[in-house]
Amino acid sequence: MKSVLVVGLGRFGRHMAAKLIEEGNEVLAVDINEERVNDALDLVTNAQIGDTTNEHFIASLGVGNFDLCVVAIGDNFQSSLETTALLKDYGAPFVLSRANRDVHAKFLLRNGADKIVYPEREMAERLAVKFGTDNIFDYIELTPDYSIY
């Protein structure tokens, strides 16, 4: 069981938090939007309303105690960038950040992200491989260059 912080409870963040819980992990979900936090209360271990671009708020979360921090903010790149940097500044051991474009990924990596995820792109590629070919039922991506079909 891992302890995970999920920042941003839009579609991606909410699904990520729910799946992490389903897999037996503890999840603290954070969003600046009170309605999103209230909607997630039954899905996660704990949920808080807060601005993750605020240093005092990040410090209060004890981010160094989480195994994984997921920055799932998709609609505000500046907030995503600041949150990623603050998480690393306050001791987060591993930060997975969402990017919508390659230029976003470049800045997120420079500011502390350990891994970048492109949810829409990655799912589109996976579905194109699965449904665009008659003989492939599923595949596992081992690295960006190698997959098992």
What residue spans do the PLM features occupy?
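Cytosolic regulatory regions of ion transport systems
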Residues: 1-149
